[in-house]
Every structure is written in structure tokens, then in C-alpha cells.
Amino acid sequence: MEIDAVLLNLVFYYLFFLFFFFVSGSTKISLDILLIFTMIVGLANYFVILFRSSPILPWDLLSVGTAATVANNYTFSITYLVAQLAAGFLGCIILAGKCNLHFPALSAKKTIRGLIRLALCCVLIIPSACYVHFLYQPDIADYTSLDNTLFTPKYMFKTNGFFVAFLMDSRYLRIDEPNGYSKEYAKSLLDEQTETSSTADDLPNIVVIMDECFSDPTVLGDFSCNEDFMPYIRSLLDGAPNTISGHLYVSVLGGNTANSEFEYLTGDSMAFLPSGSIPYQQYLNKYALSIVSHMEELGYSTTAMHPYNASGWNRSSVYEKMGFGQFLSLKNFHHGEQLRKYVSDQADFEEVLDVLNQSTDPAFIFNVTMQNHSSYGTPYDNFTPSIEAKFKNTKSTKYLNNYLSLMKYTDDAVKYLLTELSASDKKTIVVFFGDHQPNDYVVEPIYEENGLDINNQTLEEQQKRQQVPFFIWANYDIEEESNLAIS
């Protein structure tokens, strides 16, 4: 971090300290509050980066509820680094106790002294506002060493420091309309599109499966396994009958599933939104035009499915705004068999088949699975890893082996689903894709084996980290295509 970035972070600390000093009148109390606050934020940010490869961002504060529901599935280990941090924190607390200076004594009454402190707090608003305004400048990178490209939050926070980067990102909690945009022009573009008409008898069922953290890590580098972890899906990707397949570039890595949902359902791109933002939490606060409303117009019944808590990522509210006819969350599932601590893909797909069989109208189902959600280090009685990665120059880890074993469970479940649908006389299309790749700690052995640095990737390597497989399969004749690259 350059000196100007260091100084700008120090300004935040001083403003924070002065506010509580004016309120309490004590340096000890002010320093204790500052130290405890920074310790909590620092530890939280450390574990967030460890688990999802991205720092805490302003809009994460809107996702605390979602994070809390899955936090107990992670292992929070006290590493040597954490122990060092804790020791340093305790040392600073002890030193702060020695600096017990108080606000200058005044002969005025207690009420007057309180008003003076309140006035000083109000005066502090001016430099604080100037500080934030300075960090909000679009051209700040032209005259400082700060990075505001929003290319990767992890790099931006490392370059700028946590609090400076956090405040710089906060300006994107609200987005402005781009130059030249108007509702009238957007509507004129829609009016230019031609519509095709179909009767209900012509419409196939459409099942969209966004499979949690499904990916093919072999795209990252060469390695072998004791057996293929996705033989059936790989056969679909290699050019199967009535199948369109390839790889998809997604906008997220290691988490933020809701953004892949947002892009698929709305057709909008995260490229036009701030890096790290969550549209489900930040921007979808009223009716949202999506593929769902279009399906409704065509005569489809529309169902969203997710075998976990309905409140996660604000789904219950967002799905309603998108116009889904029903949302089946964990409490609505009849098939609840678990793999580890999540509903298995096998059980999830059985639930999909039930919805299809019960539907009298052509069905559009958007299904977000949970089986493969992190973390991958905890042992479970109901999960026996079957896949082991093999390397020549490095060792595999339980994280990678467990992850690949989960991919095999998904592969078996997909084979079951398509086999069942092949025997159905209802025309059905299945769209399948992963929402993102796993975190860095899972795939790091692949990088080590291939002589690559996971923390210093080329553009091509970064693109491979955003790549997941997809296929579109039908139980009737469609034109085949393979090796597509889409986003």
C-alpha cells in the first residue's frame, strides 16, 4: 500500500476516534471502542476472504441474514495469523489503558459541557463529509495511488486499505442512469422485436437448473483422478443427441449465487453494475421485468424452487416481484434427503419431477440447488468422498477431493433426471449450468501442480476461473450444437 493510501486510512481512524472522544470525553474509552471495532471488522474480513475469496463489501451488510444461515457450516480455525492478531489486539488494549486522558475540565455546568461536546461532534461532520466526498471522486486514481477500477474487490481492498476501499465502494449503493438512457428509447427497442405465437399444446416444459457451485476444475490445469467425477455430464458436453452445450462465463466466483440468478432471469449483465454488488439486495425493490413475466404471457405456470431458507438473498421478495406463480423453499419440499447438511441434488430433482407431473399447464421451473454449497472440510456420516485428485508434484486436499466427490453426486442425479424425462411423453427442455466455481482454497492444488500462482493470475487464467459448464437438453428432436462459449 502506498503512503497516500496509508494516510487516507489513518484519517478514517482519527475521525472515528475523535467522534467517540467528543462523546465520551475519555481517550481510553475512545481507543477501546476503536480497537474493538477494528478487531471485529478485521477478523470478519479475514474469514470472509478465506471462505469466498472476496472482502466485505458495503452491500454485504444487506446480506447479513443470508450469511448467518450458512455460517454454522464453516469451520472457523484459529490460525497462527489470527493468534498473532489477537495478541497484538490485547497489547494495544493494555497500552490504551495507559492513555487515560480526559476532555479538558470546564468550569461551566454539566449541561453546558454536554452542549460543547455535541457542538464538536456536529463540527466533525464537516471534515468527515469532505473526506467521503474526496473518496467519491470518479477521477481519484488520476492523482493518487488509489485503485477505483472495481476490477476485483480483493485487489482494490489490498491496494487501498479496507476502510478507504469500503467507503469508495459505498458510492455505488445507488446507481445512476447511463448517459442517453430513457424509458421511451428502451420501449422503442422492444417494440421493434417480432413475437411468435404458439398454442399451449406446442409449448414444452422448461426446467432451468442452476446447480450450486457446479464446475469442471480441469479447465484450470492438468490433473487426474481415480475416476471421472462427471462422466455423464461430460458425455452431454462432448456432443450428445438433442443437446446444446458449452461453457458459460459467469460474473461471480466462490459465492454471490444471486448474481448468476439475476443475470439469467433478467437478461441484464453485472458488467453494468458495481463490482461486488448484489442486485437482489440493492436494486430490485419493485416490479422487475424478467423471463418469468414472458413465460406467464405465453401460458406457462411459473415455479421457483430452492431447497433452503426462503429469505436467503431476499429471494421470497424478489421472486414475487418477478412474477413467479409459486416459490417452493425448503419448508415446501416433500423430498428432503440430505447429503452433508443440504438437500441432495437427487432429492431436489425428484421434487422437480413431482412439480412437472402435477402441472396441467406447460411448466417453467427455475430451480436453484444447494447440495454443493461450501464449506468442504467438515466430515459427515452421510457423505463418503469417492473421488481423489492425483498430482505428480503436489498433494491434493480434503477440500478438493470432497468438492469433486460432490460433483460426482450431481452427475449421478442429472443422469437420473434425464433418464426419467426421456421416458416421459411430455415435451421437456432442461437447461443446466453452474452458478460459479468454488473458492481459491479448494482449487489451489491444481494451480500448484501446474506451476501457476493463484494470487497472480493472467487475464486468461482469470477468465478460466469464471467458467462453468452448461447444457440444454430436450427429450425430443432439436438441433445439436457443442463447444459454445457464452456469458
PLM region descriptions:
Residues 1-153:
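Transmembrane and membrane-interface helices of multi-pass
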Residues 194-200, 210-211, 216-487:
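Solvent-exposed soluble domains appended to multi-pass membrane proteins
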Residues 5, 52, 58-61, 74, ...:
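Membrane-interface micro-motifs in multi-pass membrane enzymes
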Residues 131-208:
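Membrane-interface segments at or immediately adjacent to transmembrane helices
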Residues 125, 149, 156, 232-235, ...:
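Alpha-helical scaffold segments in carbohydrate-active enzymes
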Residues 72-75, 80-81, 85-86, 181, ...:
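Membrane-proximal soluble helical/coiled-coil segments
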